[in-house]
Amino acid sequence: MARAAATAERGASPHSLKREYYDALRQLTLELAGIQLGRDHAFLIETRLASLARAEGFPSLADMVDELFATGQNRLAVRVVSTLLERDTRFFSDMRSLQLFAGVVLPALRRADLGRPARILSFGCASGQEAWTLAMIARQSVAKLGGEPPEIVGVDYPSAALERARAGVYTHFEAQRGLPIRQLLANFEPAGPDGTDWRVRDALRRNVRFEDFHLLSRLDPLGQFDCVVFRGSLRRYSGPAQVRVLRGVTQVVGENGFLLLGTGDAVPHVGYGFEEVDGLSNLLRRRVVKPVEADTEAEPKRTRFGPG
């Protein structure tokens, strides 16, 4: 009641914000996620956060933002930022990078004879289409070449999009965008009250999971991965955030593991212990540092601290 009264007193529309709040929300997004929203994002801010305000039980968007900056709620701040950063993702997008995954990464991991299922990280997985796409490609590879299907882990900020990824349910429109009909029928089943949605089948779901994760935090708790897939969003980050994100993802890539970026992406200042595969800027592999073998027969150097 108090919130509604405050809104009425302001005489503002349920979706209007104080002008200074736009700058504050852009700064919050930069600080929490390392991504700078443009000054032309006012419409995006209002439309996306209006839905979140209703879901959170606020009578208006202005009331939610007032409370966010008055109390500094960490949970609400994360929800706000993750809602602002939700990306429109689709199945089998950026086929050139997916061809590298299918034709280079998976065969190399199979030849490595890991003695366990390979582990693949979908970093910034949004609503899950990338992770499910990787799982479908891997399933085809296993059917053709043998071996075990990899474990695929999708991580992103907690959001409604991530919950949809976990549910594995997509509208007919979403399923049609990029998903070949054979893949749709083999890996999805009709869902929803009228059967017009599509749900991931258990056979595909078995090796895929999704986790809430702050993408700028250390990834060590997730363990080591044989390939980190980070496609199409590197350029969204500010310069310092790019360095922080790349340090995080490269630290969890195991020996001989891969980092797969989107087509056109590249690691700034190539390094981080990786080298390009076949001159491709978006496919990197961890360099293996060979230990130097000691020459046991060599005569020790004579120094004043040494023998003699």
Stretch-by-stretch model annotation:
Residues G115-G128, E151-V153:
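Conserved class I S-adenosyl-L-methionine
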Residues F123, K144, E148-V229, S233-A241, ...:
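Extended basic-aromatic, gly/pro-enriched interface segments that bind polyanionic ligands
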Residues S127-L145:
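Conserved SAM-binding loop of SAM-dependent methyltransferases across substrates and taxa
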Residues V243-E255:
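A short glycine-rich, Lys/Arg-flanked "PGG" loop and its adjoining helix->strand segment in the class I
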Residues E255-T263:
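Conserved beta-strand signature within the Rossmann-like core of class I S-adenosyl-L-methionine
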